[in-house]
């Protein structure tokens, strides 16, 4: 009997152990990401050819304690390597694990390599050569918890590579993952009609057809790890392969199970057909180009097993939620009598099905943890957490309180925005506490920002509520799901103030009281325009005529644009970020503003204020609540440091000048007593600067008009 370890993705251990038991292996023991077993050579060959779940099978040669480099060397040296391969063969070492005396895997691999070479030499043979690529013999070594396992790669390249895939589609599903889906769903135990409406390159259907037609998954592989092993029994292996070929030929002819696959992408369907042809099962599968929402059940009952689209692509969340919701509705109405098994990494999407799962399991698609849910669809299958919707009922009814509120807001603000001369505004700001989001409209796009939920609310609850918001929006306000962009806003912390989100850009031009501004809806958490400061910017513009204007912490320079359009004599725009200064220059260009009177300065604003000797007639400053940027020498806290800041700024203010000071700290308290002693006059102007669309959130910012006290 020989000792083996069958490696597999995490979550496969139970299924793999069952498969090995069915093969007739003994001493089966589940481990992390694999299963140990014993088998005679003939059975090991058969398992290697027929396993549908294992990624790799290794022959365990040594396993024992290892607490030093010397012990590691001795463990490898004690093996009679010449009994396993010739010195004419090349070999490589694949070492996994660190800890204790092993600081890196290269050190461990080198020790084993030295031991192998020395053992050949000491036995009177020439040393074999190491080959980094395509070695004849691959030695696998694993070090964990003071135990070293030394093995030989028996199966060769990863067993999920069946040999039938020509090229992969986007986000391909590994073959052994598809096989495990078929096993855990219960389909393999009782093969029946199978449908995959998101078939992609056909992996689930092809793996199922291989099972139903009794075709060995390794039959088309042209390389195995044992081929250069000295104990390899070519005659026995040939006999096993020939037997598998005969079974495959007969199995295809006898197979009565029906397979149906479709995908909306014709290129993927063509690829699926090529893969099925390569696998020898094309005649068993009916492929079509179709939208999954239009696919009808091909039989009264069967299995629908699929891996629908999911992912984190910014802007796609609402579209995907709509898809999943409609899928759940279709399953409920049209697939009574069917079983559904679905693999998805996003619990929000799964919850959008609104169906109760019979069983929920975890599987890994590569490094991505996924949910694998099983559903039984009865003729009167009902949705979970929501009543069955009668035909024609608005989808927004899944979150009626939210839908009704935002519909009402949209009706109110649309007329107001047209009258104001703006096309970007806030529609909803956590009006209903359960739906803790902000919804902003930018032309015909909508940006949804999720606020950080209290720790007392379970994550599943917040995700479900967010899912309902995104599902309700299209019908509630008439927005295209493609044009809903999802962002997550957390409590502002230092340099996260302008957090970069995505390299891709979705840029628009918005209009505000005659000024034009560039927006980037996907590149950053913020879009380039703080909507709550709309009236503050207009106020700056109204006060700018003939004045020297300074804009500090300028961001994308929108207040500077209003100042310039308002007739400012000069405008100086200061920000620490070159990116935002470049953006500010673009905004000036959009408004046909150019000239030497417009200056853009990249600098630490606090240091720039200390060094400045100029005076200005109008200063606008909207500093961060807190900042500890690497470019700043000291941290800044607006509550702690505002008196010192205003004391420096008042020196830059001309005798009749005005300073507009704003910040977003909700519990900010102006130290008027100290400022009065400094002969600084402060006047709160929140009522003047709070737009109608932010009246529900009066603490969104604090704004003050500041002058010299003797004026």
From Swiss-Prot:
One GO CC term on file: cytoplasm
Subcellular location: Cytoplasm
Parts of the chain that traverse the membrane: none
Pfam families, alphabetized: Methyltrans_SAM (PF10672), RlmL_1st (PF22020), THUMP (PF02926), UPF0020 (PF01170)
UniProt entry tagged with the keyword Cytoplasm: yes
Alphabetized PANTHER family for the sequence: RIBOSOMAL RNA LARGE SUBUNIT METHYLTRANSFERASE K/L, RIBOSOMAL RNA LARGE SUBUNIT METHYLTRANSFERASE K_L
Protein name: Ribosomal RNA large subunit methyltransferase K/L
Organism field: Shewanella oneidensis (strain ATCC 700550 / JCM 31522 / CIP 106686 / LMG 19005 / NCIMB 14063 / MR-1)
């Amino acid at each position: 009997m020989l000792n083996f370890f069958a490696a597999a993705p995490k979550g496969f251990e139970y299924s793999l152990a069952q498969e090995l038991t069915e093969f007739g292996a003994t001493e089966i023991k589940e481990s992390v990401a694999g299963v140990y077993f014993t088998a005679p050579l003939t059975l090991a060959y058969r398992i290697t050819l027929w396993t549908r779940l294992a990624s790799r099978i290794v022959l365990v040669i040594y396993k024992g304690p290892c607490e030093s480099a010397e012990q590691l060397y001795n463990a490898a040296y004690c093996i009679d390597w010449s009994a396993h391969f010739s010195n004419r063969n090349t070999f490589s070492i694949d070492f996994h694990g660190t800890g204790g005396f092993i600081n890196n895997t290269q050190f461990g691999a080198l020790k084993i390599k030295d031991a192998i070479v020395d053992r050949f030499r000491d036995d009177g043979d020439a040393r074999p050569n190491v080959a980094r690529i395509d070695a004849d013999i691959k030695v696998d070594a694993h070090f964990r918890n003071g135990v070293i396992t030394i093995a030989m790669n028996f199966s060769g390249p990863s067993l999920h590579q069946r040999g039938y895939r020509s090229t992969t589609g986007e986000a391909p599903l590994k073959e052994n993952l598809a096989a495990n889906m078929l096993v855990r769903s219960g389909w393999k135990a009782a093969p029946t009609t199978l449908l995959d409406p998101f078939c992609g390159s056909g992996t689930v259907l092809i793996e199922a057809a291989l099972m139903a037609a009794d075709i060995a998954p390794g039959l088309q592989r042209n390389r195995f790890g044992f081929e250069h092993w000295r104990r390899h029994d070519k005659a026995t292996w040939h006999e096993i392969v020939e037997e598998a070929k005969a079974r495959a030929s007969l199995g295809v002819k006898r197979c009565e199970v029906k397979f149906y696959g479709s995908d909306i992408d014709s290129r993927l369907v063509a690829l699926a057909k090529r893969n099925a042809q390569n696998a020898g099962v094309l005649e068993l599968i009916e492929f079509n180009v179709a939208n999954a929402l239009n696919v009808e059940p091909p039989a009264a009952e069967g299995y629908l097993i699929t891996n629908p689209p999911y992912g984190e692509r910014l802007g796609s969340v609402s579209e995907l939620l709509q898809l999943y919701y409609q899928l759940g509705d279709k399953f409920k109405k049209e697939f009574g009598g069917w079983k559904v098994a679905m693999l998805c990494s996003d619990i929000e999407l799964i919850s959008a099905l609104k169906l109760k799962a019979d069983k929920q399991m975890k599987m890994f698609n590569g490094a991505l943890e996924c949910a694998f849910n099983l559903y039984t669809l009865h003729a009167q299958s009902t949705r979970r957490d929501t009543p069955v919707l009668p035909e024609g009922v608005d989808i927004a009814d899944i979150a009626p309180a939210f839908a009704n509120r935002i519909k009402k807001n949209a009706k109110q603000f649309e007329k107001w925005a047209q009258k104001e001369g703006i096309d970007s505004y806030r529609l909803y700001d956590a009006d209903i506490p359960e739906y803790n989001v902000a919804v902003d409209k930018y032309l015909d796009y909508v940006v949804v920002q999720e606020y950080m939920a209290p720790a007392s609310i379970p994550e599943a609850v917040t995700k479900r509520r967010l899912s309902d918001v995104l599902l309700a929006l299209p019908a509630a306000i008439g927005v295209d799901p493609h044009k809903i962009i999802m962002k997550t806003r957390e409590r502002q912390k230092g340099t996260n103030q302008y957090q970069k989100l995505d390299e891709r850009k979705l840029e628009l031009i918005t209009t505000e009281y005659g000024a034009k501004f560039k927006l980037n809806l996907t590149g950053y958490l913020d879009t380039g325009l703080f909507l709550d400061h709309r009236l503050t910017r207009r106020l700056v513009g109204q006060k700018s005529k003939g004045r020297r204007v300074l804009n500090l912490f300028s961001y994308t320079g929108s207040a500077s644009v209003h100042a310039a359009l308002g007739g400012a004599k000069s405008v100086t725009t200061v920000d620490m970020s070159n990116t935002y200064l470049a953006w500010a220059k673009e905004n000036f260009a959009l408004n046909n503003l150019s000239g030497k009177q417009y200056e853009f300065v990249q600098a630490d604003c606090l240091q720039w204020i200390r060094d400045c000797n100029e005076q200005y007639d109008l200063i606008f400053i909207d500093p961060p609540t807190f900042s500890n940027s690497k470019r700043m020498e000291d941290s800044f806290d607006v509550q702690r440091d505002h008196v010192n800041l205003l004391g420096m700024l008042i020196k830059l203010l001309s005798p009749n000048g005005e300073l507009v000071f704003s910040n977003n700290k909700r519990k900010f308290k102006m130290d008027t007593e100290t400022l009065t002693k400094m002969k600084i006059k402060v006047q709160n102007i929140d009522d003047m600067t709070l737009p109608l669309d932010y009246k529900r959130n009066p603490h969104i910012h604090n704004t003050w008009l500041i002058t010299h006290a003797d004026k």
